[in-house]
């Protein structure tokens, strides 16, 4: 919510900076659960650190969640403090061609959202049948992140 309110970010700059540092830390290894009677419930909406999981090459396990989280960090100005998020962003930008379209190797299907946090965020186009249709969502999100970071974009 703070990421969407620039005036509040400026007024509470110290708090926003501390929050950015907190959200850039790796998430705890131990699962967080809430005890409700005899049942244990794992909440989907609680962020206890950076939820992005990436392999050695920088590919995220949950691409929509990674893009959503990178966008939030970019809006808050906290992306530089999150090493996993910057590694994933660098990997995604490396998969872009010379005109800026995200074209990874072997894209056979739309990347699946594994976390319920991103249901409202991804995909923009549900019926992507062609390879170009599958690339649109990620390309748009990368362009939005680049714009939030203040990078110049050229329309081709």
Summary of predicted features, one role per range:
Residues 1-85, 106-154:
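An alpha-helical repeat/solenoid feature that recognizes helix-turn-helix modules
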Residues 92-113:
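Short, solvent-exposed beta-strand-terminating loops
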């Amino acid at each position: 919510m703070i990421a969407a309110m620039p005036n509040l970010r400026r007024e509470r700059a110290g708090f926003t900076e501390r929050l950015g540092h907190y959200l850039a830390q790796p998430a705890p290894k131990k699962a967080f659960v809430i005890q409700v009677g005899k049942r244990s419930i794992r909440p989907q909406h609680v962020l206890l650190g950076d939820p992005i999981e990436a392999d050695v090459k920088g590919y995220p396990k949950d691409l929509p969640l990674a893009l959503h989280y990178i966008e939030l960090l970019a809006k808050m100005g906290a992306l530089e403090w999150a090493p996993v998020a910057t590694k994933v962003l660098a990997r995604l930008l490396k998969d872009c061609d010379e005109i800026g379209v995200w074209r990874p190797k072997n894209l056979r299907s739309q990347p699946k959202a594994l976390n319920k946090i991103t249901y409202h965020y991804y995909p923009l186009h549900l019926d992507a049948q062609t390879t170009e249709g599958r690339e649109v969502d990620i390309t748009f999100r990368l362009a939005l992140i680049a714009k939030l970071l203040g990078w110049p974009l050229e329309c081709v």
